[in-house]
Amino acid sequence: MKLLLLALPILVLLPQVIPAYGGEKKCWNRSGHCRKQCKDGEAVKETCKNHRACCVPSNEDHRRVPTTSPTPLSDSTPGIIDNILTIRFTTDYFEISSKKDMVEESEAGQGTQTSPPNVHHTS
């Protein structure tokens, strides 16, 4: 039982002491490590997950960038499909007027004024 209690803290602390067990991720073309703080002689090249820095040894040339194959361009001459897919955008304009303007127009358009009908209530 004492051996188990002694082995348990060792297994818990082992990943913190040994980087290989700590799971430090590789970054920057597998030449750097993600850490909270870089060691002496290391430079920060990018940001890793969980707010960690990608620490790369500064004595090596790490300007290598992953190579990608160039994307071949198709025929650049416009075809019939390009003409069909051309969309012209139009904007509709609306005229906004106030109630006062509308009342003035309606009064000018009506030749005669009619009074509202009288309503009689009987009980």
From Swiss-Prot:
Family recorded in the similarity comment: Belongs to the beta-defensin family.
GO process terms (BP): defense response to Gram-negative bacterium; defense response to Gram-positive bacterium; innate immune response; killing of cells of another organism; negative regulation of cell adhesion; negative regulation of lipopolysaccharide-mediated signaling pathway
A single MF term (Gene Ontology): lipopolysaccharide binding
Subcellular location: Secreted
GO terms under cellular component: extracellular region
Modified how: The three-dimensional structure formed by the three intramolecular disulfide bridges is indispensable for antimicrobial activity.
Signal peptide per UniProt: 1-19
Annotated gene: DEFB118
Name under which the protein is recorded: Defensin beta 118
InterPro entries: Beta-defensin (IPR050544), Beta_defensin_dom (IPR025933)
Protein's UniProt keywords contain Transferase: no
Species name: Macaca fascicularis
Compositionally biased region (Polar residues): 109-123
